[in-house]
Amino acid sequence: MFRAPCHRLRARGTRKARAGAWRGCTFPCLGKGMERPAAREPHGPDALRRFQGLLLDRRGRLHGQVLRLREVARRLERLRRRSLVANVAGSSLSATGALAAIVGLSLSPVTLGTSLLVSAVGLGVATAGGAVTITSDLSLIFCNSRELRRVQEIAATCQDQMREILSCLEFFCRWQGCGDRQLLQCGRNASIALYNSVYFIVFFGSRGFLIPRRAEGDTKVSQAVLKAKIQKLAESLESCTGALDELSEQLESRVQLCTKSSRGHDLKISADQRAGLFF
């Protein structure tokens, strides 16, 4: 007979405890000097709006790193085309010079040595063509190593940013509890996408994902491999930004819904107060 009131008291105590904990909690991913107190209610519009702003800020930073990766891939493609043109030109010069040298040497008995001048010019042209090819290959190796360092820095930065976002999402899902299931599912989907990207960087990075092998370091195959890896990493990060965009849209709709309901409640209270003045 006395169990029902006891359960009610426990439920009220649980709500008060959760509300009190929410008042004192902060977003852990903001860092020192940037922590902000959360709203009084776990599902209030102010708390959702604050979390949405934080999420959009972190999403923008992550998207900026994706743009940097895409720019690196474009630079590698332009470098590959220039190297291809230089190699074709160098090979053509080498072939032309070698042909001229052979013709000059073969005609030297007939021309009494005059064609040796043509042979010398041909050798010079062949040497110049070889120099162009070697210079192009060295430039390709140097640019590959430079772009590789940039990609490694971007990957490390993205990994740190995704860990911050994951801490925010874990905090949000924990305090969302059994509230809006659709919003909670969007948060979990975003967490899964971020976890997959972090594992993608850590797992493949430890096995040479971003570092070409020494056997491939001086070949043109390594550039194509590096470009493919960069594109794969960018696609993985874009899946994270897509999941964060979906969560942000859900947050925006919930904020608007909460705002409308709170306005309607305030209007109803004001109408009741005005009606009470006449009685």
Swiss-Prot record:
Residues 226-253 form a coiled coil. One of its GO terms (biological process) is lipoprotein metabolic process. It is found in: Cell membrane; Cell junction; Cytoplasmic vesicle, Secretory vesicle. Is a modulator of endothelial barrier permeability, required for proper organization of endothelial cell-cell junctions and cytoskeleton. It also plays a role in the modulation of secretory autophagy. May affect blood-brain barrier permeability. InterPro entries: ApoL (IPR008405). The chain crosses the membrane at residues 83-105, 122-142, 192-212. Keywords: Cell junction, Cell membrane, Coiled coil, Cytoplasmic vesicle, Disease variant, Membrane, Transmembrane, Transmembrane helix. PANTHER family: APOLIPOPROTEIN L (PTHR14096), APOLIPOPROTEIN L DOMAIN-CONTAINING PROTEIN 1 (PTHR14096:SF1). It comes from Homo sapiens. It is linked to Bleeding disorder, vascular-type: An autosomal dominant disorder characterized by increased bleeding tendency, without platelet dysfunction. Affected individuals experience spontaneous episodic bleeding, usually beginning in childhood. Clinical manifestations include epistaxis, oral cavity bleeding, menorrhagia, and excessive bleeding during surgery or childbirth. It comes from the Eukaryota. Pfam families: ApoL. Belongs to the apolipoprotein L family. It is a multi-pass membrane protein. One of its GO terms (cellular component) is Weibel-Palade body. Expressed in neonatal dermal microvascular endothelial cells. One of its GO terms (molecular function) is lipid binding. Its main location: membrane. Induction: In neonatal dermal microvascular endothelial cells, by hypoxia. The lineage of its organism: Eukaryota, Metazoa, Chordata, Craniata, Vertebrata. This is Apolipoprotein L domain-containing protein 1.
